[in-house]
């Protein structure tokens, strides 16, 4: 029977509930438990697929094609368990399900209300499909007091009574700010946050308190007294140098012990944290440093590239080097020479994106990497721009462009109208909806034997996650290959190009998929490990 941990947040947003949930999941896993993590998002969008990357951050795609919150990326990276579409739900999805049921007549004429219909839908989501797990950790998005989060708070309050006694624990993450003028940490914001949570009928079992310095014992006792939790359940969550220090830091503070004690599991199995200690040791004591330029469109909000950033650091862990990132807005290269920006970097990465803005700058970056023999990694849009660059400057297709940018006589990149998913033919039109209509989720690809990318994978058959509606036009394949660009990977039916490379280049690879979504600190993705290895070699030449 599964036990449930509900994680809420207070005082301010962006405190790191997702990291806290993921770290707790990793600690319970290290003790041999089977763990599932789920995210409840209060916003009214059905999913984050159509939300601006500069507002919401990255859209994390699962194997089964769900567009989800970026916290699911943290869950996967810390636990190694692949998330599914049933691990994330939004208020928009909840209401859509309820309205569909009402239209079908499922409620038999009843007046549909927030309580019980919305809360029941949330509760059904939380408890469904958990028979194979020992612990289910549910993160509730937003902050206590947000009007959008009220139905979720009510639902998890009810679950405390619905579930068998002793199978639900509430963890509240708060902030303890330091006031320089007073020279001390303040408990009052946490007191008020807990008071508001208690007013909703939820009494936290554990307080996880963020702070930028050690919390004095007297202040912990004060929080224990005023917030009605055990002194041992006031856990300090101090700032750390990198997020992969968090599991060990929380273990030292006793978070996992306190959670297990709250469930009455004593004595608990000892955790095996050696792999995490090795990761942290590699990060703390690098044997070198490489600089990677990320030429992107959404560089104003780094969360738009969260999985990408982490995957690059995983590549650094694999090679025992520190990875320094240089962020460059691609529009800069449409007005300026890229050379001064790129001459000193050891690798260039052009990530995914949408729309014409900044595309020419990405094309210039690809050309610089090709001509100067700098390691280049093009992901999704980054692969498409590298192919357009090759078409223009190697194959003499002067008008080469993408139909995403408007009508063109040379559609080297075009809208996908048909592709195969499993045994079904998927069809799309330019006039269709934006939400949920891309080529989403895991698809297989066949790599050409003897190519660099097949050597990196150690296989010719791979499966990777996709999120795109435009694709390199296979009609240009022969023309481009005659100029030296190799289409090293295709969809199994041979219709959709998946990977490209230059055999005479130290490391120039483009992929239509998103390998960053499957990289883990304990298991770095081979492409990122190889890219950073190539950048390390380049660093010895610059």
From Swiss-Prot:
Residues given in the record as ATP binding sites: 14-19, 71
Sample GO molecular function, one term: glutaminase activity
Ranges for region Amidoligase domain: 1-265
Activity regulation statement: Allosterically activated by GTP, when glutamine is the substrate; GTP has no effect on the reaction when ammonia is the substrate. The allosteric effector GTP functions by stabilizing the protein conformation that binds the tetrahedral intermediate(s) formed during glutamine hydrolysis. Inhibited by the product CTP, via allosteric rather than competitive inhibition.
Pathway entry: Pyrimidine metabolism; CTP biosynthesis via de novo pathway; CTP from UDP: step 2/2
Chain ranges of the Glutamine amidotransferase type-1 domain: 291-541
EC top class, as a word: ligase
Entry keyword Kinase: no
Sites where the protein binds UTP: 13, 186-191, 222
EC number: 6.3.4.2
Catalyzed reactions per annotation: UTP + L-glutamine + ATP + H2O = CTP + L-glutamate + ADP + phosphate + 2 H(+); L-glutamine + H2O = L-glutamate + NH4(+); UTP + NH4(+) + ATP = CTP + ADP + phosphate + 2 H(+)
Binding positions for Mg(2+) per the UniProt entry: 71, 139
UniProt binding sites for L-glutamine: 353, 381-384, 404, 469
Database matches in InterPro entries: Class_I_gatase-like (IPR029062), CTP_synthase (IPR004468), CTP_synthase_N (IPR017456), GATASE (IPR017926), GATase1_CTP_Synthase (IPR033828), P-loop_NTPase (IPR027417)
Catalytic residues of the enzyme: 380 (nucleophile), 514, 516
Biological process annotations from GO: 'de novo' CTP biosynthetic process; pyrimidine nucleobase biosynthetic process
Keyword set, alphabetical order: ATP-binding, Glutamine amidotransferase, Ligase, Magnesium, Metal-binding, Nucleotide-binding, Pyrimidine biosynthesis
Pfam families recorded: CTP_synth_N, GATase
One GO location term (cellular component): cytosol
Residues engaged in binding CTP: 13, 146-148, 186-191, 222
Note: CTPSs have evolved a hybrid strategy for distinguishing between UTP and CTP. The overlapping regions of the product feedback inhibitory and substrate sites recognize a common feature in both compounds, the triphosphate moiety. To differentiate isosteric substrate and product pyrimidine rings, an additional pocket far from the expected kinase/ligase catalytic site, specifically recognizes the cytosine and ribose portions of the product inhibitor.
Family: Belongs to the CTP synthase family.
Cited function: Catalyzes the ATP-dependent amination of UTP to CTP with either L-glutamine or ammonia as the source of nitrogen. Regulates intracellular CTP levels through interactions with the four ribonucleotide triphosphates.
Subunit annotation: Homotetramer.
Protein name listed in UniProt: CTP synthase
């Amino acid at each position: 029977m599964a036990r449930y941990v509900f994680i809420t947040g207070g005082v301010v947003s962006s405190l790191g509930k997702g990291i806290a949930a993921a770290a707790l999941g990793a600690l319970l896993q290290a003790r041999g438990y089977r763990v599932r993590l789920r995210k409840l998002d209060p916003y009214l969008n059905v999913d984050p697929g159509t939300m601006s990357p500069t507002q919401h951050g990255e859209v994390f795609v699962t194997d089964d094609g769900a567009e989800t919150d970026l916290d699911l990326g943290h869950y996967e990276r810390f636990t190694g368990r692949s998330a599914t579409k049933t691990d994330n739900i939004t208020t928009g999805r909840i209401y859509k399900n309820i309205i569909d049921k009402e239209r079908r007549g499922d409620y038999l004429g009843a007046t549909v209300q927030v309580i019980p219909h919305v809360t029941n839908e949330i509760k059904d989501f939380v408890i469904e499909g958990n028979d194979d797990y020992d612990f289910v950790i549910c993160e509730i998005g937003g902050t206590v007091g947000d009007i959008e989060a009220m139905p979720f708070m009510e639902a998890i309050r009810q679950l405390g009574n619905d579930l068998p006694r002793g199978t639900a624990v509430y963890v509240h993450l708060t902030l303890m700010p330091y006031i320089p003028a007073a020279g001390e940490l303040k408990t009052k914001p946490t007191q008020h946050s807990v008071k508001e949570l208690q007013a909703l009928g939820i009494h936290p079992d554990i307080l996880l308190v963020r702070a930028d310095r050690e919390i004095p014992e007297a202040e912990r006792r004060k929080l224990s007294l005023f917030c009605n939790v055990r002194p041992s359940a006031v856990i300090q969550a101090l700032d750390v140098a990198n997020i992969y220090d968090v599991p060990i830091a929380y273990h030292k503070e006793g978070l996992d012990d306190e959670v297990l004690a709250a469930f009455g599991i004593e004595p608990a199995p000892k955790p095996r944290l050696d792999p995490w200690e090795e990761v942290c040791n590699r990060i703390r004591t690098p044997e070198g440093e490489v600089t990677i330029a990320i030429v992107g469109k959404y560089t104003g909000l780094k969360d738009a590239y969260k999985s990408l950033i982490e995957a690059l650091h995983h590549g650094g862990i694999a090679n025992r080097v520190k990875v320094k990132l240089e962020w460059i807005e691609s529009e800069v290269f449409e007005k300026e020479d890229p050379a001064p920006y790129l001459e000193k970097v050891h690798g260039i990465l052009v990530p995914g994106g949408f729309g014409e803005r900044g595309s020419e700058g990405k094309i210039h970056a690809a050309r610089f990497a090709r001509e100067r023999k700098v390691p280049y990694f093009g992901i999704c849009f980054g692969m498409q721009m590298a192919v357009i660059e090759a078409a223009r400057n190697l194959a003499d297709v002067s008008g080469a462009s993408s139909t995403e940018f408007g009508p063109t006589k040379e559609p080297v990149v075009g809208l996908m109208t048909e592709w195969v998913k499993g045994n079904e033919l998927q069809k799309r039109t330019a006039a269709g909806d934006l939400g949920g209509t891309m080529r989403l989720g895991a698809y297989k690809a066949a790599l050409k034997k003897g190519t660099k990318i097949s050597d990196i994978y150690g296989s010719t058959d791979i499966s990777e996650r996709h999120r795109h509606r435009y694709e390199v036009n296979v009609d240009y394949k022969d023309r481009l290959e005659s100029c030296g660009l190799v289409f090293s990977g295709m969809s199994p039916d041979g219709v959709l190009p998946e990977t490209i490379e230059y055999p005479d280049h130290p490391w120039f690879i483009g992929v239509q998929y998103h390998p960053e979504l499957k990289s883990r600190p304990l298991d770095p993705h081979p492409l990122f490990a190889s890219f950073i290895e190539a950048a390390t070699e380049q660093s010895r030449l610059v």
